[in-house]
């Protein structure tokens, strides 16, 4: 576990002052995210990802923010009034998250249903392409769809070096041993960027409940989302995990694999921010 890590800055602080982007209310109950000259399909990908995750609500999945409309440069979503979490809400969220994962995906690396463009990972101001594909095994998906592409991008931006790729290749070589029986898990319907800032808590409907926002939704491994919850700290994480385990027990050794699943987002932080995240990535690989 690396819960002691903290983001060096919020996305909005990192890119403060950049024009042509933002988030604002556009009416009662409606919220607009916008960015001029956004990458092709960026907001459609997020919108379809939210809808895809939301489809799992019929199977007991968590509430997902409603999507009203999207265009090339904007996404209109439901406004949610935030409040603090409770132990019961956290446990209920864990149960619901397990059900969302159980809703599944066609392959590891699948894009949200109905979307065939580029998927993205990262902040509104600097999203990077996230590979999609039809990998049948989790090790190949993690190696070819996640770790290698992100480290290559870090090298292109001169934040990472050949040494980091060597460390990454060593991890990839060890994946069969690291994954263990988790390699047998079927593709899950994952949020893909489930740090604490993308889990809102609200009492809009009465009892406190979690609402998911800002996904990088895809077919992945269920432990990805749990590792992201752990990465920068999450209120009542123990209760969330207890709820999750009650609905879908995790494969033995899942705690030891948390660092593995955190490599991709930390490599992403190397790409976006550089600095101390590079040494952190190297330490995690070792």
Identify what each model region corresponds to:
Residues 131-134, 138-143, 152, 185-189, ...:
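Active-site Asp-x-Gly
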